[in-house]
Amino acid sequence: MSGPAAVIAVTSLSLEARIALGPGVSVICGRASHIVSRLQAAIERGTLGIISFGVAGGLAPDLATGDCVIGSGVHTEYERYPADRRWSRRLLESIPGSVHAEIAGVDAPIAQSSEKVRLHACTGAKAVDMESHIAARIAARHDIPFAICRTIIDPAVRDLPPAAVIDLRDDGTPDVPAILHSVMHERNQIPALVRIAIDAWTARNALLRDRQLLGAGLGCPYFDERASEPVRVGVFATTQLRPTGP
């Protein structure tokens, strides 16, 4: 934690964490199942805001690899958590060409393009990830400002092969033995993995550029003002949604 009032960035990949880390920013990294306890512990040390930062899958057909999405909020199946408007506006102003849109929060990877089309149609979300809804839920519980900054890695038309959706290790690094095992058993996924590797490189460069544009505190306006005036934030609302199925 960089001081008692740093911004907390929530990521899954260790690569995302390395990019996010900087002045005024601490990082929670790892599998979604471990984020809750780690984020709760970090909040106890004090924070001015929580941001979901990293890569995301594309749901809208007009988004390409490397495009930046600033979340207006995140949907789960039954709930919607809005992002802090002031922070989101700062992010949009800082990153040229960024898109302001809803994010879908899921608990399992969305691997097939047909699933992406369905999720986009059902929710209107333009991107999907597995961390934003977890971070948003905890931020809402503690009335902490929340934001989303995500870069598209796999566009809506891209199917992900089995090796690409294997769970990460606890520290946010790829489980290389499991990936190799998958490839050895299904060698026909190699061309798709090569395409994904190219997408990942493009997304990584875009994410690094966006991070540099945001500067200290990842664009959090409350971080900028902490030395000159008290932080005042409103109640973080949660909207209950009806189930889409029976």
Could you tell me what each predicted segment is?
Residues G3-P246:
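Glycine-rich phosphate- or other oxyanion-binding loops that anchor nucleotides, phosphorylated ligands
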